[in-house]
């Protein structure tokens, strides 16, 4: 069969179409956006088979999916001149279809990764890719991003939004989704006065800008041409052996291969309305590409992270990021290393990129045998996960306890739990690559790795349980190695620990000697951990080896519990060498209180003084906090905390009157406690209220009281530990108490 050859890198994969090829088999045409060796972009096409049963298994909560059902969904999403909301109500099915198709594509063409050069081979009579192999001179490139900003002001009937919100399942009160449901059901006036759809796409060489009052009418303002940013191309592909080739159309980006949207200036619906306009103009006849997006707005309970994943048209990946350069760099890094799957596909990202098909019974059985053999090889005692079913959390310190000296090192394993999984499944080279990148200090990979392991119990429970067993066995081996060096592990929390050497008083050990001892200890503990995995018959993929990091050498420590402690290196001075874990700081007031307590702790340990002096300093610090709170008593952002949408019941009626502000209600919901009429303060979500926000009086005291109580409790514990350390068997002469009621008149 005649073939053509070219070289380029895959920059994006989008769904083009899907149709039934049997009761349980769907054919999916994929469009691969490729940057060719000449620097220009082109579209390549691949045809794969997807099992409908597999889609059903992945789409948890979706009803049984058939191939005919997938064809119906694809046809609806490709219909020109329709609102681009075909994915609403079917997001789980679309996610499962995309992941299944992407995995099938990798199996058909050979494994590929975004922005990695490949030798592309396609048959000339079908126009379809048949392989994407790594050439001998392969080299990585970097994504070329355009910047997208969009905004939407659209009239949607408030009563329809309220009805959609009321119809949502328990824990599914996302107001952004309620607005989308009202739009889908015909309750949006697309030509109402005051409507605005704004769209701006900027590349290194061009700017495309439009403002519409009515998306169906010519724009009010314009700059640039569509041809400046996208080229219209036609291709011939043969999707069935005996059928004639069909013409498929695509937009190919000019001088960019991905889009970065500023999260603070981005409306996915505004962008989709503009894309729908282009879609209708391009696909006047012939097969049309699916048009749809995935985002937290489609989830009844919202999601923690913001994203906008373009399933199909216009075929270019979109990354939602903060405006600062560091965040964009980290998000693009995660985008490239996960082939665009993060964060949209959550717990499934690295499974989709890996070799194991969890829908294949034989493959799962093989992995389960490997897991069972590894667990059987672990030493008895403390390695079965029964004592610590989520990983070891322990402390030998009394509560509270205080220590000082130059030898309090802290260590932790980089990407610990994903690394242990990578030992069980060393074939998953993409996971190993992400672990290596995280170990090299690339922070953009951390959220995806945390989510991967957090969801592993739902994807493959035996693997999760095995990882926990390995983690606990490693913890036991690390402690034995530490004890052999006369080091006491004071606190061990899942992937890290801190403690002290017992062969000399810490305060008399020179810092250089303490540092050398800590580094030698790190090496011993690293070797002990590696020995556990080798004994279990496990070996990692290259780049996914265990890595125990030395996190610092501290001079002072105060511990209240395993998950609540303060470490400080006085040689660094101030807050620079400080690690403070466990203080409640959900609001800006809480964060201020945490800084105040840290300052009091530094004062107490660095310059020994009478407890009464520390208590007086604490009273002054709390007075300063109260005065700052008074000055910002009406500042909603100062008092604001967040809670998941799923934790809310019915929201106040006023929260549904924010119009376009509701579009942002798809993640953790910001709220403040406000004063009720002769009742306890209650939480009020303020993010969807029209600006300027007019609230009932903020219940400042309700926000402050628990924070100040915890400050006093933790400080008194530290003072008690200090007194005991100095050899005083009696409690401190004076405990710190702060009477917030003395200031009630300020907040009345």
Curated annotation (Swiss-Prot):
Compartments annotated for it: namely: Host nucleus
Predominant subcellular localization, coarse grouping = host cell
Tell me the InterPro entries matching this sequence. Answer: HSV_HEPA
Query: Which is a Gene Ontology cellular component entry for this protein?
Result: host cell nucleus
| Entry keyword annotation includes Transport | no
**What Pfam families does the database record attribute to this sequence?**
Herpes_HEPA
Query: Which domain of life does the protein's organism represent?
Result: Viruses
One GO term of the biological process aspect: DNA replication
Keywords, A to Z, come to: DNA replication, Host nucleus
Q: How does it assemble?
A: Associates with the primase and the helicase to form the helicase-primase complex. Interacts with the origin-binding protein. Interacts with the polymerase catalytic subunit.
Q: Which family does it belong to?
A: Belongs to the herpesviridae HEPA family.
Name of the protein this chain belongs to: DNA helicase/primase complex-associated protein
Gene symbol here is UL8
């Amino acid at each position: 069969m005649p073939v053509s050859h070219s070289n380029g890198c895959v920059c994006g994969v989008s769904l083009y179409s899907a149709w039934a090829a049997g009761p349980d088999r769907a054919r999916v045409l994929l469009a691969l956006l490729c940057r060719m060796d000449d620097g220009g972009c082109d579209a390549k096409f691949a045809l794969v088979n997807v099992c409908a049963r597999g889609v059903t298994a992945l789409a948890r909560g979706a009803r049984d999916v058939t191939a005919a059902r997938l064809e119906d969904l694809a046809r609806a999403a490709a219909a020109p001149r329709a609102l681009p909301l075909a994915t609403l109500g079917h997001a789980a099915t679309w996610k499962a279809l995309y992941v299944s198709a992407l995995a099938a594509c990798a199996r058909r063409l050979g494994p590929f990764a975004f922005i990695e050069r490949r030798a592309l081979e396609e048959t000339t009579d079908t126009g379809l890719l048949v392989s994407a192999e790594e050439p001998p001179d392969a080299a990585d490139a970097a994504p070329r991003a355009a910047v997208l900003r969009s905004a939407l002001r659209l009239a949607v009937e408030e009563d329809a939004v309220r009805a959609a919100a009321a119809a949502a399942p328990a824990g599914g009160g996302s107001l952004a989704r309620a607005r989308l449901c009202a739009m889908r059901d015909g309750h949006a006036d697309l030509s109402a006065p005051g409507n605005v759809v704004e769209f701006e796409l900027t590349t290194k060489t061009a700017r495309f800008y439009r403002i519409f009052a009515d998306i169906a009418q010519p724009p009010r303002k314009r700059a640039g041409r569509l041809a400046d940013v996208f080229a219209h191309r036609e291709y011939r592909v043969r999707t069935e052996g005996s059928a004639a080739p069909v013409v498929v159309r695509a937009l190919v980006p000019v001088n960019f291969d991905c889009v970065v949207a500023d999260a603070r200036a981005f409306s996915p619906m505004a962008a989709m309305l503009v894309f729908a306009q282009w879609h209708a103009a391009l696909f006047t006849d012939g097969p049309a590409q699916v048009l749809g997006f995935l985002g937290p707005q489609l989830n009844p309970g919202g999601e923690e992270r913001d994203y906008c994943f373009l399933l199909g048209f216009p075929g270019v990946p979109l990354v939602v990021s903060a405006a600062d350069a560091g965040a964009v760099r980290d998000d693009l890094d995660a985008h490239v290393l996960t082939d665009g799957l993060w964060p949209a596909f959550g717990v499934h990202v690295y499974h989709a990129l890996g070799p194991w098909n969890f829908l294949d019974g034989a493959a799962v059985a093989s992995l389960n045998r490997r897991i069972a053999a590894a667990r059987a090889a672990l030493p008895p005692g403390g390695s079965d996960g029964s004592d610590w079913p989520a990983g070891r959390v322990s402390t030998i310190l009394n509560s509270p306890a205080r220590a000082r000296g130059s030898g309090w090192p802290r260590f932790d394993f980089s990407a610990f739990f994903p690394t242990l999984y990578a030992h069980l499944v060393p074939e998953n080279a993409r996971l190993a690559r992400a672990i290596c990148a995280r170990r090299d200090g690339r922070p953009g990979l951390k959220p995806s790795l945390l989510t991967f392991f957090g969801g592993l119990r739902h994807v493959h429970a035996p693997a999760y349980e095995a990882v926990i067993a390995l983690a606990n066995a490693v913890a036991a081996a690390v402690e034995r190695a530490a004890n052999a060096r006369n080091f006491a592990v004071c606190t061990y929390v899942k992937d890290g620990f801190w403690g002290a050497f017992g062969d000399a008083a810490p305060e008399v050990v020179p810092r250089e000697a303490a540092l050398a001892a800590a580094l030698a200890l790190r090496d011993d503990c690293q070797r002990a951990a590696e020995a556990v995995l080798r004994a279990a018959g496990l070996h990692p993929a290259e780049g996914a080896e265990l890595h125990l990091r030395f996190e610092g050498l501290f001079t002072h420590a105060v511990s209240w519990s395993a998950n609540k402690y303060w470490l400080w290196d006085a040689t660094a001075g101030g807050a620079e060498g400080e690690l403070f874990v466990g203080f409640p700081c959900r609001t800006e007031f809480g964060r201020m209180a945490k800084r105040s307590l840290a300052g009091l702790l530094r004062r107490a340990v660095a310059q020994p003084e009478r407890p009464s002096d520390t208590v007086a300093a604490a009273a002054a610090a709390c007075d300063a906090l109260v005065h700052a709170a008074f000055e910002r008593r009406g500042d909603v952002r100062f008092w604001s905390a967040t809670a998941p949408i799923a934790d809310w019941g019915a929201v106040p009626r006023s929260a549904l009157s924010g119009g376009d502000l509701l579009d942002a209600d798809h993640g953790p919901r910001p709220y403040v406690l406000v004063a009720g009429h002769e009742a306890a303060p209650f939480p009020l979500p303020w993010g969807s209220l029209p600006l300027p926000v007019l609230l009932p009086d903020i219940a400042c005291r309700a926000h402050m009281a628990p924070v100040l109580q915890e400050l006093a409790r933790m400080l008194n514990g530290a003072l008690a530990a200090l007194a005991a350390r100095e050899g005083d068997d009696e409690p401190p002469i004076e405990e710190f108490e702060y009477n917030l009621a003395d200031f009630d008149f300020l907040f009345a």
